[in-house]
């Protein structure tokens, strides 16, 4: 099975622009891999985002186990990439993260799937780490809203 993932961050965008970007790419399901699916940006917290996506025919799923733990988020904010990678690698070894990874790979084989987190630039986000480590054979398209 050939896997293809889209990635998208909502940093600096609006819900309408975000929806336009994922719709234009043909995304059919969006998987939120934030540990905490909350946002100060209007419309990007879990319930509001799910509703907005479902209104345009895109399914929403939150996989908390693939999120970055608090100490990893702190390392990322402070630019400590090696610490972020070490912390996130340990997170992905947890049984619930292993199960979530299997679920995400299955979903991506069924329909065009986007990974969501906050950061606009994928290189600075754990979604790129997940893809590099857990789906290295996948093709990846980074979306920018």
Where are these predicted regions, by residue range?
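Residues lining hydrophobic/aromatic ligand-binding pockets adjacent to catalytic sites
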Residues: 1-145
């Amino acid at each position: 099975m050939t896997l293809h993932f889209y990635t998208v961050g909502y940093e600096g965008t609006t819900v309408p622009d975000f929806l336009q970007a994922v719709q234009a790419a043909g995304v059919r399901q969006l998987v939120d891999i934030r540990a905490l699916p909350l946002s100060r940006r209007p419309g990007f917290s879990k319930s509001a985002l799910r509703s907005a996506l479902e209104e345009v025919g895109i399914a929403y799923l939150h996989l908390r186990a693939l999120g970055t733990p608090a100490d990893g988020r702190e390392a990322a904010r402070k630019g400590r990439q090696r610490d972020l990678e070490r912390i996130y690698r340990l997170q992905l070894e947890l049984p619930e993260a292993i199960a979530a990874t299997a679920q995400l790979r299955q979903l991506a084989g069924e329909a065009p799937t986007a990974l969501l987190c906050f950061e606009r630039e994928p290189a600075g986000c754990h979604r790129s780490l997940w893809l590099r480590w857990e789906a290295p054979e996948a093709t990846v398209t980074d979306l920018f809203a």
